[in-house]
Design a protein with these regions (language model features):
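A generic "folded-domain core" signal
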Residues: 1-135
């Protein structure tokens, strides 16, 4: 997904719309590269529905692994945002993996977990082409 600009190169991110088992869109994920030399090799923005239980955080697990928890940054009328820093080893896991499972907990049903599958097919080729974003 690219943003058109008047001048220079259009910044692009890897984008995936995640749907539930019934085909309803539930979450959006955008992944981008970060400048070299920082603790994070890449960044990701995950947008989930309002009424997500924010204190339970967002979990991302690749190919059935334990996964990592990430806090939510803010909510607006569109949804709740988690802005994530991915380490070089996280990026390598995405490149080697087949599926990243993203899990959230709904506020109205705190005893349940909603798990969405993010395909990692083509991640390596796509990641190598996305823009380096400075923010």
């Amino acid at each position: 997904q690219c943003i058109r600009t008047e001048q220079g190169e259009d910044p692009c991110t890897l984008y995936q719309l995640l749907s539930d088992d019934d085909g309803n869109p539930v979450a959006e994920v955008s992944v981008f590269r970060l400048p070299e030399g920082g603790r994070a090799a890449a960044g990701a923005t995950v947008i989930v529905p309002l009424e997500t239980l924010l204190t339970e955080q967002l979990r991302i697990a690749v190919d059935g692994g334990q996964g990592k928890l990430y806090p939510f940054s803010f909510c607006n009328p569109i949804g709740c945002y988690s802005r994530i820093g991915l380490t070089a080893s996280d990026v390598e896991a995405f490149k080697r993996g087949a599926v990243a499972r993203i899990s959230i907990v709904p506020f109205p049903a705190p005893d349940q977990t909603v798990t969405l599958d993010m395909s990692l097919s083509g991640f390596t080729a796509g990641f190598d082409k996305v823009s380096v974003l400075n923010n």
